[in-house]
Amino acid sequence: MLIPPINLHAWIEEHRHLLKPPVGNKCIQQDGFIIMVVGGPNARTDYHYDEGPEWFFQLEGEMVLKVQDEGVARDIPIRAGEVFLLPPKVPHSPQRAAGSIGLVIERERLPNEQDGLQWYCPQCNHKLYEAMFPLKNIETDFPPVFDRFYRSLALRTCSQCGHLHPAPERYATVED
């Protein structure tokens, strides 16, 4: 059975209160593609690794898509009305401004594919930690990996330069 069209503007107005930290992300459809509306602000320091492409459409406000491009950290600004297709396997960290709203479309993962979360040292860009996992639910599969990284001084300490990667305030207690 076909799903009726969604009035995206009406959906955003009805759910705007959910598009805020700490998650700021709501899946509106999932059938072959994962279609999400994402609100800002956010303060992500992780990089997402997806074996498929991701399509970004900035509806309101601005965002910066931080990417790791062949070992170099780079910023890609995406403004309201702009779209950007991120190629597969490019680690990326969406940084969304307060009040911003974006639409992100990813294809559902193939059975043999894994998603990843990576962290890089903000001082020297050395990869600190990477976790790969089969993605089942984008809203619930990420938080345990965030918890593991942010609660560990060992994982957050750069082996190259010794810098301690900062953790969000909600991770005030660490397990190491």
UniProtKB/Swiss-Prot annotation:
Substrate binds at residues 54, 96, 106. Pfam families: 3-HAO (PF06052). It is an enzyme of class 1 (oxidoreductase). Gene3D superfamilies: Jelly Rolls. Its cofactor is Fe(2+). The keyword Iron applies. Pathway: Cofactor biosynthesis; NAD(+) biosynthesis; quinolinate from L-kynurenine: step 3/3. InterPro entries: 3hydroanth_dOase (IPR010329), RmlC-like_jellyroll (IPR014710), RmlC_Cupin_sf (IPR011051). O2 binds at residue 44. Fe cation 2 binds at residues 121, 124, 158, 161. Its EC number is 1.13.11.6. Fe cation 1 binds at residues 48, 54, 92. GO terms for biological process: anthranilate metabolic process; L-tryptophan catabolic process; NAD biosynthetic process; quinolinate biosynthetic process. Keywords: Dioxygenase, Iron, Metal-binding, Oxidoreductase, Pyridine nucleotide biosynthesis. SUPFAM superfamilies: RmlC-like cupins. Binds 2 Fe(2+) ions per subunit. Homodimer. Catalyzes the oxidative ring opening of 3-hydroxyanthranilate to 2-amino-3-carboxymuconate semialdehyde, which spontaneously cyclizes to quinolinate. HAMAP family: 3_HAO. Belongs to the 3-HAO family. This is 3-hydroxyanthranilate 3,4-dioxygenase. The lineage of its organism: Bacteria, Pseudomonadati, Pseudomonadota, Gammaproteobacteria, Lysobacterales. The gene is nbaC.
